[in-house]
From Swiss-Prot:
Ligand binding ((2E)-4-hydroxy-3-methylbut-2-enyl diphosphate): 41, 74, 124, 168, 226-228, 270
Annotated protein name in UniProt: 4-hydroxy-3-methylbut-2-enyl diphosphate reductase
UniProt binding sites for [4Fe-4S] cluster: 12, 96, 198
EC number: 1.17.7.4
HAMAP family for the chain: IspH (MF_00191)
Lineage of producing organism: Bacteria, Pseudomonadati, Pseudomonadota, Gammaproteobacteria, Moraxellales
Molecular function terms, GO-annotated: 4 iron, 4 sulfur cluster binding; 4-hydroxy-3-methylbut-2-enyl diphosphate reductase activity; metal ion binding
Gene that this sequence comes from: ispH
Keyword terms of this UniProt record: 4Fe-4S, Iron, Iron-sulfur, Isoprene biosynthesis, Metal-binding, Oxidoreductase
Gene3D superfamilies in alphabetical order: 3.40.50.11270, 4-hydroxy-3-methylbut-2-enyl diphosphate reductase, catalytic domain
Tagged with keyword Endoplasmic reticulum: no
UniProt source species: Psychrobacter arcticus (strain DSM 17307 / VKM B-2377 / 273-4)
Amino acid sequence: MQIYLANPRGFCAGVDRAIAIVNEALLRFEPPIYVRHEVVHNKFVVSDLANRGAVFVEELHEVPDGSIVIFSAHGVSKAVEDEAERRDLTVFDATCPLVTKVHIEVAKFAQDGMDAVLIGHAGHPEVEGTMGRFNHRHGGRIHLVENESDVEALSVQDAERLAFVTQTTLSMDDTARVIDALREKFPHIQGPRKDDICYATQNRQDAVKHLASRCEVVLVVGSPNSSNSNRLRELAERMNCRAYLIDNATEMDINWFDGIQSVGVTAGASAPEVLIQEVLQQLQDWGGDLPSELSGIEENVTFSLPKALRIPMTQVGK
């Protein structure tokens, strides 16, 4: 059985930064270090950080006044920021800079009194944070749509003063169809100068298309609550591959590969390479060939840590 490995795959710059922020905080400060929501959507990563002292909570009321808290990579609403300031919490913001870019866009539309349309998945923490960045005091409203049917039912205050943004981890193909529907219904709608779907999401979706074109089965390493990992699985299925989303190698079933000549492996943006390597090793133990890594875009994006976490440890407290 041939094994193909997608390129790029796994960690993106925003995930690297978010995990590094938690790691640095654990090194520099006395526990407990609180993290609002899973810092990234991966069970292995969250469990590892929890074992080293991070305390994960869903809401700030679980954090004692005056504590250190880290906001997850998915971002938070303005109300959460305000509550943290009110309660004298020391905040390290691990929001992905590409999510922050969308927050800035939404805030500007609100300031201008426009309606905004957010293309995204209801209930996802990134969507909740972005919706919570829209200030309604200037007369505008923000609307959430997930698909073309939502667009069809959408009613806005002024179709000529309307803009859209998107969640950063969506299916590019699905989102393009929703944007087309918006532009058809609202010809004057404004969009971002550059696509809000992040570079890593785009690159991993392109890579899984390349992978699925030559494989019968595709394995996506990622947690069930990872939006971008789910989109990779769906994309492989649309290309007529059997696709499985797995947290780790223990979730694989040898029967998946009966009679299979080729299997592809990729990973969502929050899945660490160690889990991918364990999957590859299990496939080889079951008779697979040495993996062949496909060609792909080389990623060299990096995001810096907050200034307070970049100060050399020897200078902390001086």
